[in-house]
């Protein structure tokens, strides 16, 4: 019995190391594999170290993606109550702010989360204006654990806007959902009545297809919390993401 107990300890340690490696690889791959970050942010080693700290409760995987200093952005124009047909009952677009000619902020009334308007920013495809009859695929970029209600961390702290500027896809950036994992919560819900999965899978696609020329083909990735959510959403909705 003594020999068995001693010999099992290294195996347990190796199992823990393998489990941690798998855990750390997910946020690292999802956050860095897309090549969206500017030159200055942390390396993969830094992210893995922070993932290790997060595993033991000492920090957040998204600590390296600072959320302070949100830029002040003044829309170049605003469209109130745009007419979009074919939306689910209780869903409407209340306002569209044109931050630039290629970046818009949609403020959506959700039937699933009706308490407050939900903001979704869209980076429009390269040929959006020059080819107004074309429809475009989507790439969804989900935020980290400390997601702000004002703007996605992807546009605050990475070069995602510049990276996709020459690509013919609409980039979809849900705003908000701090600590939600973009899921439907039962309780407790932080006073937010989180129904993010319902919103993103049952309501948002109709807005994008009927109002913003989506062709129904989409992919999803995310940072930290958003990486977990991307995997869960794709697994639970296999016909929605490719």
Residue positions per predicted region:
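Non-catalytic cap/lid and distal C-terminal segments of serine-dependent acyl enzymes
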Residues: 2-8, 17-242
């Amino acid at each position: 019995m003594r020999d068995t107990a001693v010999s099992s300890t290294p195996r347990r340690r190796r199992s823990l190391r393998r489990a941690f490696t798998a855990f750390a690889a997910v946020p690292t791959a999802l956050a860095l594999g897309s090549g969206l970050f500017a030159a200055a942010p942390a390396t993969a080693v830094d992210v893995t170290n922070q993932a290790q700290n997060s595993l033991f409760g000492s920090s957040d995987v998204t600590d390296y993606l600072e959320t302070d200093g949100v830029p002040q952005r003044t829309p170049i124009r605003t469209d109130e109550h745009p007419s979009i047909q074919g939306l689910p009952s209780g869903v409407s677009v209340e306002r569209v702010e044109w931050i630039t000619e290629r970046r818009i902020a949609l403020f959506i009334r959700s039937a699933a989360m009706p308490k407050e308007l939900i903001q979704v920013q869209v980076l429009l495809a390269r040929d959006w204006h020059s080819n107004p009859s074309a429809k475009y695929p989507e790439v969804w970029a989900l935020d980290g654990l400390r997601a702000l209600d004002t703007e996605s961390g992807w546009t605050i702290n990475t070069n995602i806007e510049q990276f996709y500027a020459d690509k013919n896809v609409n980039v979809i950036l849900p705003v908000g959902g701090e600590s939600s994992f973009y899921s439907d919560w039962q309780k407790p819900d932080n006073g937010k009545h989180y129904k993010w999965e319902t919103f993103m899978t049952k309501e948002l696609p109709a807005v994008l297809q009927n109002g913003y020329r989506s062709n129904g083909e989409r992919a999803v990735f995310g940072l930290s919390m958003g990486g977990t959510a991307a995997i869960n959403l794709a697994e639970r909705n296999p016909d929605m993401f490719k």
